[in-house]
């Protein structure tokens, strides 16, 4: 009797998701380093609205969300430009989750505007072949956030 083993192809695009402080960027970097993947990482330090958002979410939510949306779309364009045959790409964000976060943070009027922009931009976003969702208890997340010492995140509460 002969046993047939079917090889599963490697995913070409991996997205890692989860709450802040769970280790998305850490895992993406480890995968990129250990397996020679291309990493596409969130760059929250570039968002000039984030500090104010953490202090008072309602005042800076739309600007913060739109900045991240445009930043992620730029990264998605870079991702799409790379040949599917070159290497595996790993991202510490899932563009489809962006809208879910917006629903929680934006007013109805802001959400209407966000939706119009989102729908226009997301048309060609690739779908990941694999999504890894990380979880951790809230106390672990808060401990990790505190340990990384980002001054913008000092205002976060559970």
Task: Enumerate the predicted regions with their spans.
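A glycine- and Lys/Arg-enriched "phosphate-lid" helix/loop adjacent to the NTP-binding pocket
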Residues: 98-158
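Hydrophobic anchor at the beta1->P-loop junction of P-loop NTPases
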Residues: 16
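Conserved substrate/cofactor phosphate-moiety recognition/catalytic segment
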Residues: 33-71
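Post-Walker A alpha-helix
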Residues: 27-28, 32
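P-loop (Walker A) phosphate-binding loop of NTP-binding proteins
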Residues: 19
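Conserved lysine of the Walker
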Residues: 24
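Extreme N-terminal, non-catalytic leader segments
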Residues: 1-12
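A basic- and aromatic-enriched beta-loop-alpha substructure that forms the phosphate/nucleotide-
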Residues: 72-109
């Amino acid at each position: 009797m002969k046993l047939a083993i079917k090889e599963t192809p490697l995913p070409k695009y991996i997205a890692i998701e989860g709450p802040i402080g769970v280790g998305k960027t850490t895992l993406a970097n480890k995968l990129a380093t250990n397996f020679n993947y291309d990493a596409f990482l969130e760059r929250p330090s570039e968002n000039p609205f984030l500090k104010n958002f953490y202090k008072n979410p309602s005042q800076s939510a739309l600007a913060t969300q739109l900045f991240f949306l445009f930043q992620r779309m730029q990264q998605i364009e870079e991702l799409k430009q790379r040949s599917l045959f070159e290497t595996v790409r790993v991202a510490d964000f899932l563009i489809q989750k962006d809208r879910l976060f917006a629903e929680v943070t934006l007013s109805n009027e802001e959400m209407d505007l966000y939706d119009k922009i989102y729908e226009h931009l997301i048309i060609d976003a690739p779908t990941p072949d694999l999504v890894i969702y990380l979880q951790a208890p809230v106390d672990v997340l808060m401990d990790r956030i505190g340990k990384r010492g980002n001054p913008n995140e000092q205002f976060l509460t559970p």
